[in-house]
Amino acid sequence: QSRSSAASDVYKRQLVFYSPLQTIFWYDKPSFYHGEPEVEWFENLQTVFDDTKVLDGTPGKNITMARRKGQEWFLAAMTNNDGSKENVSLSFLDKGKTYLAYIYTDGGKEVKTRTQVKCSYLLTDASKVMKFDLKPSGGAAVRFVPVSKDEAKKYKKYKGEVL
């Protein structure tokens, strides 16, 4: 059995497997924290949600689901030991709104943190399909936050690239 990647652990135990007792302890020991940016996921992840959608999934292969609290959405995609390519329609987002997507994926050795989680910040909306190349036993997590036009000027748009 493969060991789960750090990015996979960010949401595997936190979003897909529901529990109102969400803590950073499920991801790592607080004493091991050295400013890794993906910890913002835990700072913002809710414990109770207003809506849950299973977007895709096959038992033993993969799952993609989204949960909403207020105007924010949290998405998690996980795969098995084989890895997978996932195309996730963002049609669950409110139409006409622009969202800042806080994206957490397995980054590998090019990410110079102990956890090797790649953090990306891109603008998107309900018309887009996000593409992920999930590593074996890996996945992706995304937090979608509505942004104003002024705030949106600070970020690049998601253009369909594989994440």
Predicted regions: what they are:
Residues Y121-G160:
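C-terminal beta-strand-rich structural cap/linker in extracellular carbohydrate-active enzymes
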Residues I103-S127:
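Solvent-exposed beta-strand/loop surfaces of large extracellular or lumenal domains
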Residues R13-L21:
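Catalytic domains of carbohydrate-active enzymes that cleave complex glycans
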Residues T52-K53, T64-M65, C119-Y121, V129-F132:
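Beta-strand-rich interaction surfaces with strong enrichment in secreted/lumenal proteins
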Residues Q1-A7, Y11:
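Single conserved hydrophobic/aromatic residue that forms the stacking wall/gate
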Residues D9, Q22-T23:
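Mobile "lid/hinge" segments at catalytic clefts and subdomain interfaces of large enzymes
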Residues T58-Y99, A140-A141:
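Carbohydrate-binding surface patches
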Residues K29-F74, M78, K109-T115:
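Glycan-recognition and catalytic regions of carbohydrate-active enzymes
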